[in-house]
């Protein structure tokens, strides 16, 4: 630590003073000091995976690290916020300022509402280092869509072992007599579901080189594929031998034919009455479950229709009674 401090001091004295002055001027302008968070945030690993995938794809397409922007969706109950999913946003740069494509956002929001009706827009995310004035500029645009949005920033280039994710909320502070928007960092916890735990466990078992060839799932599938491929080649060889024996192309070898016959009898017999009964029972159970789900969905739709009809009928009845009082 002392060596790092000495190196920083030497850099500051050899021409890096202007950069340090800029950093010192930038950090206070976007971060609020001594402000505690007003909400509790629970972050799902799926969001982090989505952001990482978004950044990696864009880096592969552009050939260099780029900043990505997206939306955060989830649930909010009072002061408790649960960030459960995310989707990408389009943006373009005008005079070195990032402008969000709001029409694209509204289109994506409508699509997500059709699938995830219970989720709502909570904020936005981006990638990079500490927050800067450009993040404030984008945050103000998001504030036009939703009041008090969250801001999540992931730093994919960090070398630290801790999770490089920070969550912020915006506060308004008076600086030099003017109302200024600043960021206040929030503490968050990780919340997982069963499907997420399986996916995260698979990612955690990947090798440090980033290759998926040595993952547990890949090794299991490769072993199964090799076994099935070998079985197919052996069965094909036996079938060709039997056909050649029947055609008289090769002499009969009764020992090999007996082994092939015994192998065929080792296979389960699927033409018994018990198998047919169990098979049809299982088909009926699956069909009944699907039919029950359809009936439940239909009843729910009919119930909503009846409720709306009753509300409309009551309003019309009130209108008729009101007209009867005046005529």
Curated annotation (Swiss-Prot):
> Highest taxon of the source?
Eukaryota
Is Nucleus a UniProt keyword of this protein?
yes
Q: Which Pfam families match?
A: JAB (PF01398), MitMem_reg (PF13012)
The compartments listed are: Nucleus; Cytoplasm; Cytoplasm, Perinuclear region
Q: Which UniProt keywords apply?
A: Cytoplasm, Host-virus interaction, Nucleus, Signalosome
Family (UniProt): Belongs to the peptidase M67A family. CSN6 subfamily.
Q: What is this protein called?
A: COP9 signalosome complex subunit 6
Q: Which organism is it from?
A: Homo sapiens
């Amino acid at each position: 630590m002392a060596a790092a401090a000495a190196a920083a001091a030497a850099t500051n004295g050899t021409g890096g003073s202007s950069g340090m002055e800029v950093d010192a001027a930038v950090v206070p302008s976007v971060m609020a000091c001594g402000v505690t968070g007003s909400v509790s945030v629970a972050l799902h690993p799926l969001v982090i995976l989505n952001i990482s995938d978004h950044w990696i794809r864009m880096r592969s397409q552009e050939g260099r690290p780029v900043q990505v922007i997206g939306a955060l969706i989830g649930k909010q109950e009072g002061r408790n916020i649960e960030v459960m999913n995310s989707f990408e946003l389009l943006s373009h740069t005008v005079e070195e300022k990032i402008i969000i494509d709001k029409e694209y956002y509204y289109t994506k929001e409508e699509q997500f509402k059709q699938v995830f009706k219970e989720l709502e827009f909570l904020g936005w995310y981006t990638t990079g280092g500490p927050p800067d004035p450009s993040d404030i500029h984008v945050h103000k645009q998001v504030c036009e869509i939703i009041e008090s949005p969250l801001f999540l920033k992931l730093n994919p280039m960090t070398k630290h072992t801790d999770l490089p994710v920070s969550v912020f909320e915006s506060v308004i502070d008076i600086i030099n007599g003017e109302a200024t928007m600043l960021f206040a960092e929030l503490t968050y916890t990780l919340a997982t579901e069963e499907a997420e735990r399986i996916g995260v466990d698979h990612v955690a078992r990947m090798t440090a080189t980033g290759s998926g060839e040595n993952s547990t799932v890949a090794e299991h599938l490769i072993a199964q594929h090799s076994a099935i491929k070998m079985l197919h080649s052996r069965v094909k060889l036996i079938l060709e031998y039997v056909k050649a024996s029947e055609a008289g192309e090769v002499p009969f070898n009764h020992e090999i034919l007996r082994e092939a016959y015994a192998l065929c009898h080792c296979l389960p017999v699927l033409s018994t009455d018990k198998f047919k009964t169990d098979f049809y029972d299982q088909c009926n159970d699956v069909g009944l479950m699907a039919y029950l789900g359809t009936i439940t969905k239909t009843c729910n739709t009919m119930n909503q229709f009846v409720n709306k009809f009753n509300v409309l009928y009551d309003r019309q009845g009130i209108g008729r009674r009101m007209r009867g009082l005046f005529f």
